[in-house]
Design a protein with these regions (language model features):
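ATP/NTP-dependent adenylation/nucleotidyl-transfer catalytic domains that generate, transfer
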Residues: 1-42, 52, 56-59, 64-67, ...
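Conserved G/P- and acidic residue-centered "switch" motifs that form tight phosphate/ATP-binding loops
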Residues: 47
Length: 327
Protein backbone atom coordinates (compact mmCIF):
# COMPACT_ATOMS: atom_id res chain seq x y z
CA UNK A 1 0.00 0.00 0.00
CA UNK A 2 1.36 3.41 -1.01
CA UNK A 3 1.95 5.82 1.84
CA UNK A 4 0.23 9.18 1.82
CA UNK A 5 2.35 12.15 0.84
CA UNK A 6 3.74 13.78 3.97
CA UNK A 7 2.15 17.18 4.61
CA UNK A 8 1.53 19.45 7.59
CA UNK A 9 -2.06 18.17 7.68
CA UNK A 10 -1.22 14.47 7.66
CA UNK A 11 -2.30 13.84 11.26
CA UNK A 12 -5.39 16.02 11.11
CA UNK A 13 -8.43 13.85 11.87
CA UNK A 14 -10.43 13.08 8.73
CA UNK A 15 -13.70 12.97 10.65
CA UNK A 16 -13.65 14.30 14.22
CA UNK A 17 -17.24 13.20 14.85
CA UNK A 18 -16.49 9.64 13.75
CA UNK A 19 -13.30 9.44 15.84
CA UNK A 20 -15.05 10.83 18.88
CA UNK A 21 -17.99 8.45 18.63
CA UNK A 22 -15.68 5.47 18.14
CA UNK A 23 -13.82 6.33 21.36
CA UNK A 24 -17.07 6.97 23.25
CA UNK A 25 -18.64 3.67 22.17
CA UNK A 26 -15.51 1.68 23.04
CA UNK A 27 -15.12 3.43 26.38
CA UNK A 28 -18.74 2.67 27.27
CA UNK A 29 -18.33 -0.98 26.31
CA UNK A 30 -14.99 -1.34 28.11
CA UNK A 31 -16.17 0.19 31.38
CA UNK A 32 -19.62 -1.41 31.59
CA UNK A 33 -19.10 -4.76 29.85
CA UNK A 34 -15.41 -5.67 29.85
CA UNK A 35 -14.54 -4.25 33.28
CA UNK A 36 -18.00 -4.59 34.81
CA UNK A 37 -17.82 -1.18 36.51
CA UNK A 38 -20.66 1.28 37.18
CA UNK A 39 -18.92 4.51 36.14
CA UNK A 40 -15.63 6.34 35.88
CA UNK A 41 -13.17 8.29 38.04
CA UNK A 42 -11.04 10.96 36.34
CA UNK A 43 -8.24 12.91 37.99
CA UNK A 44 -8.74 16.49 36.77
CA UNK A 45 -6.02 19.13 36.79
CA UNK A 46 -7.47 21.73 34.45
CA UNK A 47 -5.12 20.55 31.69
CA UNK A 48 -6.16 19.65 28.17
CA UNK A 49 -5.62 15.87 28.45
CA UNK A 50 -7.61 15.33 31.64
CA UNK A 51 -10.31 17.70 30.34
CA UNK A 52 -10.81 15.77 27.11
CA UNK A 53 -10.69 12.47 29.01
CA UNK A 54 -13.43 13.68 31.36
CA UNK A 55 -15.55 14.98 28.48
CA UNK A 56 -15.29 11.62 26.71
CA UNK A 57 -16.17 9.80 29.93
CA UNK A 58 -19.28 11.94 30.38
CA UNK A 59 -20.39 11.26 26.80
CA UNK A 60 -19.80 7.53 27.26
CA UNK A 61 -21.04 6.96 30.80
CA UNK A 62 -23.28 9.92 31.63
CA UNK A 63 -22.41 12.81 33.93
CA UNK A 64 -24.12 11.11 36.87
CA UNK A 65 -21.68 8.20 36.58
CA UNK A 66 -18.45 10.22 36.44
CA UNK A 67 -16.59 11.81 39.35
CA UNK A 68 -13.78 14.34 38.86
CA UNK A 69 -11.07 14.11 41.51
CA UNK A 70 -8.87 17.15 42.20
CA UNK A 71 -5.55 16.19 43.80
CA UNK A 72 -3.58 19.33 44.69
CA UNK A 73 -0.49 19.57 46.88
CA UNK A 74 1.51 22.51 48.12
CA UNK A 75 3.49 22.95 44.88
CA UNK A 76 0.37 22.91 42.67
CA UNK A 77 -0.67 25.99 40.73
CA UNK A 78 -3.85 27.57 42.14
CA UNK A 79 -5.01 27.91 38.52
CA UNK A 80 -5.36 24.13 38.31
CA UNK A 81 -8.27 24.05 40.76
CA UNK A 82 -9.98 26.99 39.07
CA UNK A 83 -9.83 25.34 35.65
CA UNK A 84 -10.80 21.92 37.02
CA UNK A 85 -13.94 23.36 38.64
CA UNK A 86 -14.82 25.20 35.45
CA UNK A 87 -14.50 21.93 33.54
CA UNK A 88 -16.62 20.00 36.03
CA UNK A 89 -19.32 22.67 35.96
CA UNK A 90 -19.35 22.63 32.16
CA UNK A 91 -19.94 18.87 32.02
CA UNK A 92 -22.10 18.58 35.13
CA UNK A 93 -19.96 16.16 37.12
CA UNK A 94 -19.50 15.88 40.85
CA UNK A 95 -16.03 16.77 42.15
CA UNK A 96 -14.04 15.70 45.18
CA UNK A 97 -10.90 17.48 46.36
CA UNK A 98 -8.19 15.46 48.07
CA UNK A 99 -5.19 17.52 49.13
CA UNK A 100 -2.24 15.13 49.18
CA UNK A 101 0.32 17.42 50.85
CA UNK A 102 0.22 15.56 54.18
CA UNK A 103 0.51 12.22 52.38
CA UNK A 104 3.59 13.44 50.52
CA UNK A 105 5.13 14.79 53.71
CA UNK A 106 4.60 11.35 55.25
CA UNK A 107 6.51 9.75 52.40
CA UNK A 108 9.28 12.32 52.78
CA UNK A 109 8.68 13.55 49.22
CA UNK A 110 9.62 17.19 49.82
CA UNK A 111 12.41 16.42 52.30
CA UNK A 112 14.11 13.91 49.99
CA UNK A 113 13.75 16.23 46.99
CA UNK A 114 15.05 19.27 48.87
CA UNK A 115 18.04 17.34 50.24
CA UNK A 116 19.16 16.60 46.67
CA UNK A 117 18.55 20.16 45.51
CA UNK A 118 20.56 21.52 48.46
CA UNK A 119 23.56 19.41 47.43
CA UNK A 120 23.52 21.24 44.08
CA UNK A 121 22.71 24.68 45.50
CA UNK A 122 23.72 24.86 49.21
CA UNK A 123 21.77 28.13 49.57
CA UNK A 124 18.52 26.48 48.42
CA UNK A 125 15.63 26.65 50.86
CA UNK A 126 12.08 25.89 49.68
CA UNK A 127 10.77 28.83 51.73
CA UNK A 128 12.99 31.28 49.83
CA UNK A 129 13.29 29.68 46.40
CA UNK A 130 11.08 28.09 43.76
CA UNK A 131 12.59 25.27 41.74
CA UNK A 132 12.25 23.14 38.63
CA UNK A 133 14.27 20.73 36.52
CA UNK A 134 14.40 20.97 32.75
CA UNK A 135 16.20 19.99 29.56
CA UNK A 136 17.97 22.84 27.79
CA UNK A 137 19.00 20.98 24.63
CA UNK A 138 17.67 21.55 21.12
CA UNK A 139 16.46 18.24 19.65
CA UNK A 140 16.81 19.52 16.09
CA UNK A 141 20.41 20.64 16.46
CA UNK A 142 22.09 17.76 18.27
CA UNK A 143 21.76 14.06 18.93
CA UNK A 144 22.72 13.26 22.48
CA UNK A 145 21.03 11.90 25.61
CA UNK A 146 18.98 14.40 27.58
CA UNK A 147 20.87 16.38 30.20
CA UNK A 148 18.75 17.84 32.99
CA UNK A 149 19.43 21.11 34.77
CA UNK A 150 18.16 22.36 38.11
CA UNK A 151 16.92 25.95 38.22
CA UNK A 152 16.18 27.82 41.43
CA UNK A 153 14.43 31.20 41.49
CA UNK A 154 14.58 33.59 44.44
CA UNK A 155 11.83 35.94 45.61
CA UNK A 156 13.18 38.71 43.36
CA UNK A 157 12.95 36.49 40.28
CA UNK A 158 16.70 35.91 40.00
CA UNK A 159 17.39 32.52 38.40
CA UNK A 160 20.36 30.21 38.83
CA UNK A 161 20.84 26.98 36.88
CA UNK A 162 23.28 24.08 37.09
CA UNK A 163 23.51 20.76 35.29
CA UNK A 164 22.26 18.02 37.61
CA UNK A 165 24.68 15.24 38.61
CA UNK A 166 23.11 11.83 38.06
CA UNK A 167 22.76 11.03 41.79
CA UNK A 168 20.85 14.25 42.52
CA UNK A 169 18.76 13.94 39.36
CA UNK A 170 17.64 10.42 40.26
CA UNK A 171 16.79 11.40 43.83
CA UNK A 172 14.78 14.47 42.77
CA UNK A 173 12.80 12.47 40.21
CA UNK A 174 12.25 9.53 42.56
CA UNK A 175 11.00 11.86 45.30
CA UNK A 176 8.79 13.84 42.91
CA UNK A 177 7.23 10.64 41.58
CA UNK A 178 5.59 10.15 44.98
CA UNK A 179 3.15 12.81 43.74
CA UNK A 180 1.86 10.80 40.78
CA UNK A 181 1.84 7.55 42.72
CA UNK A 182 -0.08 9.10 45.62
CA UNK A 183 -2.63 10.49 43.19
CA UNK A 184 -3.05 7.08 41.58
CA UNK A 185 -3.69 5.51 44.98
CA UNK A 186 -6.34 8.11 45.78
CA UNK A 187 -8.03 7.64 42.41
CA UNK A 188 -8.24 3.90 43.01
CA UNK A 189 -9.65 4.46 46.49
CA UNK A 190 -12.56 6.41 45.02
CA UNK A 191 -12.89 3.96 42.12
CA UNK A 192 -13.15 0.97 44.43
CA UNK A 193 -15.44 2.77 46.89
CA UNK A 194 -17.88 3.47 44.03
CA UNK A 195 -17.26 0.33 41.93
CA UNK A 196 -15.99 2.62 39.16
CA UNK A 197 -13.08 2.39 36.70
CA UNK A 198 -10.12 4.76 36.67
CA UNK A 199 -10.06 6.69 33.40
CA UNK A 200 -6.42 7.40 32.54
CA UNK A 201 -5.45 10.68 30.88
CA UNK A 202 -2.07 10.12 29.10
CA UNK A 203 -1.91 10.92 25.38
CA UNK A 204 0.12 9.11 22.71
CA UNK A 205 3.36 11.03 23.31
CA UNK A 206 3.23 10.51 27.06
CA UNK A 207 2.71 6.78 26.63
CA UNK A 208 5.20 6.14 23.82
CA UNK A 209 7.96 8.55 24.90
CA UNK A 210 7.67 7.56 28.56
CA UNK A 211 6.44 10.87 29.95
CA UNK A 212 4.52 9.21 32.77
CA UNK A 213 5.22 7.56 36.10
CA UNK A 214 4.94 3.79 36.29
CA UNK A 215 2.16 2.94 38.75
CA UNK A 216 1.48 6.67 38.93
CA UNK A 217 -0.30 8.55 36.14
CA UNK A 218 0.43 5.43 34.07
CA UNK A 219 -1.87 3.45 36.39
CA UNK A 220 -5.40 3.26 34.99
CA UNK A 221 -8.05 0.84 33.76
CA UNK A 222 -8.59 2.55 30.40
CA UNK A 223 -6.77 5.28 28.45
CA UNK A 224 -9.20 6.76 25.92
CA UNK A 225 -6.74 9.27 24.43
CA UNK A 226 -3.68 7.01 24.63
CA UNK A 227 -3.46 6.70 20.83
CA UNK A 228 -4.06 10.38 20.03
CA UNK A 229 -1.41 12.91 19.06
CA UNK A 230 -1.53 16.16 21.04
CA UNK A 231 -3.04 18.15 18.18
CA UNK A 232 -5.72 15.48 17.79
CA UNK A 233 -6.51 15.89 21.50
CA UNK A 234 -7.02 19.59 20.80
CA UNK A 235 -9.30 18.75 17.86
CA UNK A 236 -11.46 16.65 20.18
CA UNK A 237 -11.40 19.41 22.79
CA UNK A 238 -12.90 21.85 20.30
CA UNK A 239 -15.49 19.30 19.16
CA UNK A 240 -16.47 18.40 22.74
CA UNK A 241 -16.65 22.09 23.69
CA UNK A 242 -14.07 21.98 26.45
CA UNK A 243 -13.87 25.50 28.00
CA UNK A 244 -11.87 27.85 25.82
CA UNK A 245 -9.61 28.90 28.70
CA UNK A 246 -8.44 25.30 29.10
CA UNK A 247 -7.82 24.87 25.37
CA UNK A 248 -5.72 28.03 25.31
CA UNK A 249 -3.77 27.17 28.48
CA UNK A 250 -0.12 26.16 27.94
CA UNK A 251 0.40 22.52 29.03
CA UNK A 252 2.48 22.38 32.21
CA UNK A 253 3.88 19.64 34.43
CA UNK A 254 2.45 21.17 37.65
CA UNK A 255 5.01 19.11 39.56
CA UNK A 256 7.66 21.61 40.67
CA UNK A 257 7.12 24.88 42.53
CA UNK A 258 8.38 27.04 39.63
CA UNK A 259 6.23 27.29 36.51
CA UNK A 260 7.31 24.89 33.80
CA UNK A 261 5.96 23.82 30.43
CA UNK A 262 5.94 20.20 29.24
CA UNK A 263 8.12 21.25 26.30
CA UNK A 264 10.73 22.67 28.66
CA UNK A 265 10.68 19.68 31.01
CA UNK A 266 10.61 16.78 28.57
CA UNK A 267 9.63 17.12 24.92
CA UNK A 268 12.10 19.81 23.78
CA UNK A 269 9.83 20.59 20.82
CA UNK A 270 6.58 22.54 20.34
CA UNK A 271 3.63 20.19 19.93
CA UNK A 272 2.87 21.11 16.30
CA UNK A 273 6.37 19.92 15.32
CA UNK A 274 6.51 17.05 17.81
CA UNK A 275 3.34 15.46 16.42
CA UNK A 276 4.45 15.64 12.80
CA UNK A 277 8.01 14.50 13.40
CA UNK A 278 6.84 11.59 15.56
CA UNK A 279 4.35 10.56 12.87
CA UNK A 280 7.09 10.70 10.27
CA UNK A 281 9.42 8.61 12.44
CA UNK A 282 6.96 5.86 13.38
CA UNK A 283 5.59 5.58 9.85
CA UNK A 284 8.95 5.37 8.11
CA UNK A 285 8.98 8.66 6.21
CA UNK A 286 12.39 9.73 4.95
CA UNK A 287 13.93 12.75 6.71
CA UNK A 288 14.25 14.73 3.48
CA UNK A 289 10.52 14.37 2.68
CA UNK A 290 9.50 15.36 6.21
CA UNK A 291 11.99 18.20 6.29
CA UNK A 292 10.71 19.63 3.03
CA UNK A 293 7.13 19.70 4.35
CA UNK A 294 8.14 21.27 7.67
CA UNK A 295 10.80 23.70 6.43
CA UNK A 296 13.52 21.77 8.23
CA UNK A 297 16.74 20.23 6.97
CA UNK A 298 17.01 16.46 6.61
CA UNK A 299 19.74 16.59 9.26
CA UNK A 300 17.39 18.26 11.75
CA UNK A 301 14.76 15.61 11.13
CA UNK A 302 17.38 12.87 11.60
CA UNK A 303 18.32 14.35 14.99
CA UNK A 304 14.66 14.27 16.03
CA UNK A 305 14.26 10.67 14.81
CA UNK A 306 17.33 9.58 16.77
CA UNK A 307 15.97 11.24 19.91
CA UNK A 308 12.60 9.51 19.47
CA UNK A 309 14.29 6.14 18.96
CA UNK A 310 16.33 6.60 22.12
CA UNK A 311 13.39 7.77 24.26
CA UNK A 312 11.15 4.97 23.04
CA UNK A 313 13.78 2.31 23.79
CA UNK A 314 15.00 3.64 27.13
CA UNK A 315 11.46 3.99 28.48
CA UNK A 316 10.20 0.60 27.27
CA UNK A 317 10.42 -0.77 30.82
CA UNK A 318 7.73 1.73 31.86
CA UNK A 319 5.26 0.14 29.46
CA UNK A 320 6.11 -3.44 30.42
CA UNK A 321 3.92 -5.60 32.63
CA UNK A 322 5.68 -7.41 35.49
CA UNK A 323 7.90 -10.21 34.15
CA UNK A 324 6.42 -13.56 35.19
CA UNK A 325 8.02 -16.25 33.02
CA UNK A 326 10.53 -17.65 35.52
CA UNK A 327 9.62 -21.34 35.25
Amino acid sequence: MTKKQFTKDIIKLDDVDKTCNKIINKLKSDVYSLLGRKGGIVGISGGIDSSVSLALAVKALGSENVIGIMLPEKDSSPDSKEFALKLANKFGVRTIEENITATLEGFGCYKRRDEAMSRVFPEYNPLDFKSKISIKQNVLMQNMPSVFSLTIIDKNGLEKSKILPIREYLQIVAASNFKQRSRMSMLYYHAEANHYAVIGTPNKHEVEQGFFVKYGDGGADVMPIGDLYKNQVYELAEYLEVPKEIIERTPTTDTYSAEQTQEEFFYQLPFHLLDLLWYGWENGYQPDEVGKALDLSAEQVKHAYQTFERKNKTTEYLRMSPIRDYK
